[in-house]
Structures are given as structure tokens and as C-alpha cells.
Amino acid sequence: LKHSTMADEQATGIMKLKPSQISPRVLTVGDPARAAYVASLMKDVVTVAQNREYHTYTGTYNGVKVTVASHGVGGGGASMAFEELIMAGAKLIVRAGTCGSFQSKYREGSLFVATGAVRNDGVTDRLIPPAYPATASGETVAALQKVCEKEEGLNFSTGVMLTEGGFYDGPLGNQHQMWAKAGVLGIEMEASVLFVIAGIRGIKTGGIFNVDNYIFSRLEEGEGAAAYHPHRDIVIKGNERMCRIALEAVATMEL
């Protein structure tokens, strides 16, 4: 990977991004290693910046310029990434990440395309009142669905996700059963933050998620978080497929 040198431009404060280095089409992931994996699927890749958990690359996919960036875990840090990517010129941001499934039909390796997200993120209430919806762009949902439908043997669904601000439960417990009964597909930690920021900043957005556990099977076993094993082959292969699908959708959408 080549390292970019644009000394004359002003970089953003946290991610160190310069507008000339960023494509309007951006794919974001939590894990810096996953960002590097996505970069390996592209050509003519330039390492834009690597600061803290934020690793950013720009390259081409099927001849289209795309940027991939990692945002770490949780809505607070991710919000800084989304804001700075928009400052640097992003017009489309898609998040690809892992999730827990609330629906028994969708187990490890299944994919969810988000139409929106429940705002339990702990971040967006300070940006705009809770009545403001966290929704994906219709065009982005359609593009992700179209690519998913071409994947042989893929079990996927489209619907609402739950974004939570924390991973481990405390004395208050959780409301997983309620959200499952309400038809929420699964739980993750950043989507609603992206959707709200994209909405108020006026860009297109979306999210696709690979199931790395079925929430209720591990809770019924009485092991709780100790039964969480996200590094199995079926999950790793699902992550790779998710990244390929997201990259194709980002590269083919009209802006």
C-alpha cells in the first residue's frame, strides 16, 4: 500500500483526512483489520491515514473510487468518524458490521440489511430530539438487497436493527425479548448513530450486518456473554461475504 502525501491540505482533527484523499463513496467497518481486508479487495489502494482505531484507505473497485474506514466499537467514537468523513466529502456512507440476531430463523452467517435502527445508542439524543428517526436511505437499502439476492445460498432479511450503547448487561438487565417481539432483527452498536448523522447532514446511508450469534440460544444456555464466540469459520466467512456485498453496493449506487 502506498502512503498519501497531501501536505498542503487541512486534515480533519481525529482521523487526519484530507478531502482530496476521500471518495464520495465510503464503506465503514468497526475493526481496522476488517478495513484492511476490504482494502485488499480493491485496486490502486492508498493508505490515507491510521490514527487510533481509525484506519482509512482509498482505492478502486470495478473502476470506481471507494474509501473504506474503520470507526472502532461504540457510537461515541463512531460518530466522530462519520462526521469527519462527511467533512472530507463523503456523500454516501454504508456501515458493514457484526450483530446478534433476535430472530431464530437467522443464525450465524445470515445477513441483515437495515431499513432503520432503534436509537438506544447513548449518543444521538444530544444531537437531536428522540422523535427524529434513524433511517437508512431507500436507494441504499435497494442496492444492498439487489446484491444479496444474487448471492447463492444466502439467508438474509431486511428490517429494523437495535443500536445499543453498551455490550455487557448491568443490574438493569436488557429488553431483548421486547425488541424481538416487536420484530427487530438484531442488535449492534453504531447504525442509529450513522443514520441520524447522515440524515441531519444530508447524505445517503445504509447498513448491512453479519450475524455472529443468536442472542437467545446463548442466554438459554445460562452462559450469557461467556458463550459468545464470534471467531468461528462460519462467522469469518460471513464477514467476508458481507464486505464484498457492501463494497459492490457502494460502488454501483448513483450519488
Where are these regions (language model features)?
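His/Asp/Glu-rich mid-to-C-terminal helical/loop segments that flank catalytic regions of hydrolases
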Residues: 218-255
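A C-terminal functional module that forms or caps the active site or interfaces directly
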Residues: 173-216
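Generic non-transmembrane alpha-helical segments
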Residues: 143-153, 197, 241, 245-253
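Active-site rim beta-loop-alpha module in soluble metabolic enzymes
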Residues: 134-182
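Metabolite-binding pocket within alpha/beta catalytic cores that recognizes anionic/polar moieties
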Residues: 2-142
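Short acidic/glycine-rich loop or secondary-structure boundary segments that cap or lie
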Residues: 102-104, 120-122, 166-172, 196-197, ...
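Generic structural signal for well-ordered, non-membrane alpha-helical segments
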Residues: 27-28, 32-35, 71-78, 133, ...
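Flexible, glycine/charged-enriched surface loops at secondary-structure junctions
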Residues: 44-50, 151-159, 253-255
